[in-house]
Amino acid sequence: LPSGSFTVEELLAIMNTMPFDMTFVDRDDKVKYFSQGKERIFQRNRAILNRDVRHCHPPASAHIVDKIIEDFKSGKEDQAPFWINTGGKMIHIAYFALRNEKGEYLGTLEVSHDISGYRKLEGDQRILSYKK
């Protein structure tokens, strides 16, 4: 890696400690990975691995999935943000086109994050205060 190194065990711990969910879809539109954090927003089952991403979304949103993938592959767009209110939470969902150094499309990263707590922040917290 150009900026350091870590073991697979360390990488797994990093991916599962991040305070958001991640799902990776490869250039062939197959789901290849999802993080397994303690508080996943959208539950994932290993059965989705290697499945076409279009079969992982409700039929009503299939055209949106197709549009995002088409725009990412063509280079027209590099990210697609959404936010929804569900179950009393504000969820931010962002899709990012992953590209190599030549700009070639490698796949899509979906990042989902419960931002409810951030929306309530006021002022500063400059002194250490652990959440109990």
Question: What annotation goes with each model-predicted range?
Answer:
Residues 1-29, 34:
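Sensory modules in modular signal-transduction proteins
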Residues 4, 8-11, 114-132:
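Juxtadomain coupling helices with adjacent low-complexity linkers
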Residues 16, 20, 58, 70, ...:
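Generic surface-pattern signal
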Residues 31, 37-121:
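Sensory/regulatory domains in signal-transduction proteins
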